[in-house]
């Protein structure tokens, strides 16, 4: 079945077991908020400022041992998260911060409330990414939660452009994490071991 990116976002939160979302609405994230309206099992907490919500998500993560989750709009909404993201990074607190973004074709054109939040936060989080294809949305969210909670826990930023939120695509959520990178071989090659031993002699 096909659903839009905003509904896929909600499904992803439910699949990841998110029960509390700290959020502040705005134009480039409004479709995500609309999709959350009927979502079951997710309590939305709406502080009066984005900085308050990121610190609240940090406190939630520290007190529950779960990933704290934020949702804000682009521009000042996103930049108001920066201190909280840095705090979570320095204290190894798992957060996933979702930011709305202008449509892909407007990125780099100085559009209203366009800001390079990935560039701003890259040095203060474990991973920051802009979703550029609707078919990558579910995988990126799955990876974001995995990255936030594994190894040294910390914050992850996922920037979702408005056209990705509206684009139609599969409703399938991945069951496994798929991150490109080094995957060590678990088997041994006897011939290579013999050759290495021979070279040591």
For each predicted feature, which ranges?
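N-terminal alpha/beta PP-like core and its mobile active-site loop of ThDP/TPP-dependent enzymes
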Residues: 1-201
């Amino acid at each position: 079945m096909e659903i839009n990116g905003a509904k896929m976002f909600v499904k992803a939160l439910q699949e990841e077991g998110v029960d509390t979302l700290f959020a502040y609405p705005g134009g480039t994230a409004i479709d995500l908020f609309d999709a959350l309206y009927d979502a079951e099992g997710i309590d939305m907490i709406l502080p009066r400022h984005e900085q308050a919500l990121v610190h609240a998500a940090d406190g939630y993560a520290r007190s529950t041992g779960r990933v704290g989750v934020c949702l804000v709009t682009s521009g000042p909404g996103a930049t108001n998260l920066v201190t909280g993201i840095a705090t979570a990074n320095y204290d190894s607190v798992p957060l996933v911060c979702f930011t709305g973004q202008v449509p892909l074709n407007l990125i780099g054109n100085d559009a209203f409330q366009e800001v390079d939040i990935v560039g701003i936060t890259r040095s203060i989080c474990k991973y920051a990414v802009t979703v550029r294809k609707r078919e990558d949305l579910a995988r990126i969210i799955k990876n974001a939660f995995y990255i936030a909670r594994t190894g040294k826990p910390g914050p992850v930023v996922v920037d979702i452009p408005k056209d990705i939120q509206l684009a139609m695509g599969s409703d399938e959520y991945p069951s496994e994490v798929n991150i490109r990178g080094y995957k060590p071989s678990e088997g041994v090659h006897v011939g290579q071991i013999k050759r290495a031993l021979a070279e040591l002699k």
